Amino acid sequence: MATLFIADLHLQTEEPAIVAGFLRFLAVEARQADALYILGDLFEAWIGDDDPNPLHREMAVAIKSLVDSGVPCFFIHGNRDFLIGKRFARESGMTLLPQEKVLDLYGRNVLIMHGDTLCTDDAGYQAFRAKVHNPWVQRLFLTLPLFIRRRIAARMRAGSKAANSSKSLDIMDVNAQTVVAEMEKHRVQWLIHGHTHRPAVHELSANDQPAFRVVLGAWHHEGSMVKVTPDNVELIAFPL
């Protein structure tokens, strides 16, 4: 009995070792789970469900195989793949979730999210996020030819990398008050998220009780998952 959480794989054809590691994860660890939750940034970039990138089809088939085996897969959008839509969800068998979701996991109420909305000290990013999450902006972008979308996405990634290089690490991490506010809004003592690439289990106080924030790591040289069982919540790093 276990529910698994992963995030920030940033899958791309230029990183075949990470792709292979994810395929092994789907075929082995995930097959033993009650459910798999992917908390955003499964892909390095997503410019629309109509992008014929072979990697996308390969991942859809692999995830669908997991779902068809009896393990449901749920997905929360990240800041890199927020344009994943109903078509890819249908092809992969994934269930799309809202950006914040409370789960009842073996008697624990657990809030899950990608985590970028917690980084409220980074005002520049939050302003950018508000723009690209505007439904009208997204609809307009998706009407553009694929080659133009690719150019825009590449330019945005380059701009993001340049901007982040000049920001302090503290600004790009979560805001502690925002974390507590979210946990108290949802009346939970557990929060699982990704985005910051800083795997850790943090103890804090929320709702006048001890609380825990579990941060998933990015998949670079190793994989990262959170395994929730009736008895434990465990952050696990594993070789790819």
Swiss-Prot record:
Mode of membrane association: Peripheral membrane protein
Cofactor-binding details, from the entry: Binds 2 Mn(2+) ions per subunit in a binuclear metal center.
Keyword terms, alphabetized: Cell inner membrane, Cell membrane, Hydrolase, Lipid A biosynthesis, Lipid biosynthesis, Lipid metabolism, Manganese, Membrane, Metal-binding
Location(s), subcellular: Cell inner membrane
Residues annotated to bind Mn(2+) 2: 41, 79, 114, 195
One of the protein's GO biological processes: lipid A biosynthetic process
PANTHER family cross-referenced by the UniProt entry: UDP-2,3-DIACYLGLUCOSAMINE HYDROLASE, UDP-2,3-DIACYLGLUCOSAMINE HYDROLASE-RELATED
Role this protein plays: Hydrolyzes the pyrophosphate bond of UDP-2,3-diacylglucosamine to yield 2,3-diacylglucosamine 1-phosphate (lipid X) and UMP by catalyzing the attack of water at the alpha-P atom. Involved in the biosynthesis of lipid A, a phosphorylated glycolipid that anchors the lipopolysaccharide to the outer membrane of the cell.
The organism of origin for this protein: Salmonella paratyphi B (strain ATCC BAA-1250 / SPB7)
GO CC term (a single one): extrinsic component of plasma membrane
Family: Belongs to the LpxH family.
Cofactors demanded by this protein: Mn(2+)
GO molecular function: manganese ion binding; UDP-2,3-diacylglucosamine hydrolase activity
Listed name of the protein: UDP-2,3-diacylglucosamine hydrolase
One protein family per Pfam: Metallophos
Sequence positions that bind Mn(2+) 1: 8, 10, 41, 197
Enzyme Commission designation: 3.6.1.54
Record field: catalytic activity: UDP-2-N,3-O-bis[(3R)-3-hydroxytetradecanoyl]-alpha-D-glucosamine + H2O = 2-N,3-O-bis[(3R)-3-hydroxytetradecanoyl]-alpha-D-glucosaminyl 1-phosphate + UMP + 2 H(+)
Pathway where it operates: Glycolipid biosynthesis; lipid IV(A) biosynthesis; lipid IV(A) from (3R)-3-hydroxytetradecanoyl-[acyl-carrier-protein] and UDP-N-acetyl-alpha-D-glucosamine: step 4/6
InterPro entries: Calcineurin-like_PHP_ApaH, LpxH-like, Metallo-depent_PP-like, UDP-diacylglucosamine_Hdrlase
Residues that coordinate or bind substrate: 79-80, 122, 160, 164, 167, 195
